[in-house]
């Protein structure tokens, strides 16, 4: 999956916007080109963003835990409190999610499985099949208020061939395909209210909003929420006020990536420019949970900014059924 993802991103940078953008009806999304002017916009425009740690290659899926940052770059890597980068697990991960108990959920494409990396070092499989078929490609993930885990599968999809999917596993282990016909579904997150799932559909440069069902049903028809433009978005994270912070992958007008902050009404309220050509994902962290950590591609690594905005800590992934232990341990 990571290879496919990198190929898509290289295509975006070389060829520009997808021609399919003109075929998409964006409905009620805010398409205003006006620059945000509020207090947050002014503050972020002056904020210093620094490289927190380098990486050996293209980086994805950051998670902050007790002073350490975990991210994906050929393996699951860890940035210690001394900012030294080491390999934590020999996986092929694309996304991570911190559980309230300190465990980390991982979308792993080496084992084609959703994994739980325990704070005690035990690695367990949560999901590896859909029906009688192995999982295909796991990209990014999130958790809803009921403890269901959602992940995107963009494999083989494009604007011309929208075959991407969203999957869900319940706390009891039931795996379902809950949405399809997507043009490269990428980052996703559940808002603080627990009522809505937001998904970045990268190859249409838009963010979609799904109302979460009351029961174990598939997702309904999505509502177009925001049009990013540029090369489309990648990963995202909510702050405590319900604003969505989006890794706005690459902006042709600046030849850099940025974080775009979108309020609950679907309006861009601030931008944070990142000193890298591409920005892949973002998470909140720090002792006060008011810093952001974003992963990048050129140069590869983790960048940090003290934004002074409290991040939403995510809904708790309660007791999850573990299928089996994987038999590997972190490289401590």
Residue spans for each PLM region:
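Glycine/small-residue-rich hydrophobic helix-like segments
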Residues: 212-280
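A short loop-to-beta-strand structural motif that recurs across blades of beta-propeller domains
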Residues: 75-77, 113-115, 165-167, 206-208, ...
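Short loop/turn segments immediately following beta-strands, especially the blade-tip
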Residues: 210-217, 306-313
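A short beta-strand motif characteristic of beta-propeller blades
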Residues: 48-53, 83-89, 124-131, 174-180, ...
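A detector of repeated loop/turn-to-beta-strand junctions in beta-rich toroidal repeat architectures
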Residues: 111, 161-163, 204, 219, ...
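Beta-rich, blade/repeat-based domains predominating
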Residues: 52-67, 72-74, 90-108, 113, ...
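A short helix->beta-strand "capping" segment at the edge of beta-propeller domains
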Residues: 35-56, 222
């Amino acid at each position: 999956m990571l290879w496919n993802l990198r190929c898509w991103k290289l295509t975006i940078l070389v060829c520009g916007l997808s021609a399919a953008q003109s075929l998409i009806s964006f409905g009620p999304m805010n398409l205003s080109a006006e620059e945000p002017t509020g207090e947050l916009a002014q503050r972020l425009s002056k904020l210093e963003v620094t490289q927190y740690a380098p990486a050996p290659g293209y980086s994805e899926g950051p998670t902050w835990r007790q002073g350490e940052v975990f991210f994906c770059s050929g393996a699951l890597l860890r940035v210690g409190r001394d900012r030294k980068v080491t390999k934590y697990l020999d996986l092929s991960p694309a996304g991570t999610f911190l559980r309230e108990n300190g465990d980390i959920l991982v979308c792993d494409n080496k084992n084609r499985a959703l994994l739980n990396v325990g704070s005690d070092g035990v690695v367990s499989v949560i999901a590896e099949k859909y029906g009688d078929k192995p999982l295909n490609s796991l990209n990014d993930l999130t958790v809803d208020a009921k403890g269901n885990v959602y992940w995107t599968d963009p494999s083989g999809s494009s604007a011309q061939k929208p075959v991407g999917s969203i999957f869900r596993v319940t706390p009891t282990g039931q795996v379902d395909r809950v949405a399809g016909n997507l043009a490269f579904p990428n980052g996703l997150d559940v808002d603080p209210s627990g009522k809505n799932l937001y998904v970045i559909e990268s190859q249409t440069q838009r963010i979609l909003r799904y109302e979460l069902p009351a029961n174990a049903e598939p997702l309904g028809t999505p509502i177009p929420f925001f049009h990013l433009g540029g090369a489309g978005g990648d990963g995202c994270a909510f702050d405590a006020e319900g604003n969505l912070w989006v890794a706005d992958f690459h902006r042709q007008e600046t030849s850099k990536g940025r974080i775009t902050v979108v309020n609950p009404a679907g309006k861009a309220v601030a931008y944070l420019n990142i000193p890298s050509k591409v920005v892949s994902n973002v998470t909140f962290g720090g002792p006060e949970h008011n810093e952001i950590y974003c992963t990048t591609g050129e140069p590869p690594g983790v960048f940090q900014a003290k934004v002074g905005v409290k991040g939403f800590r995510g809904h708790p992934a309660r007791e999850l059924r573990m299928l089996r232990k994987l038999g590997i341990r972190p490289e401590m």
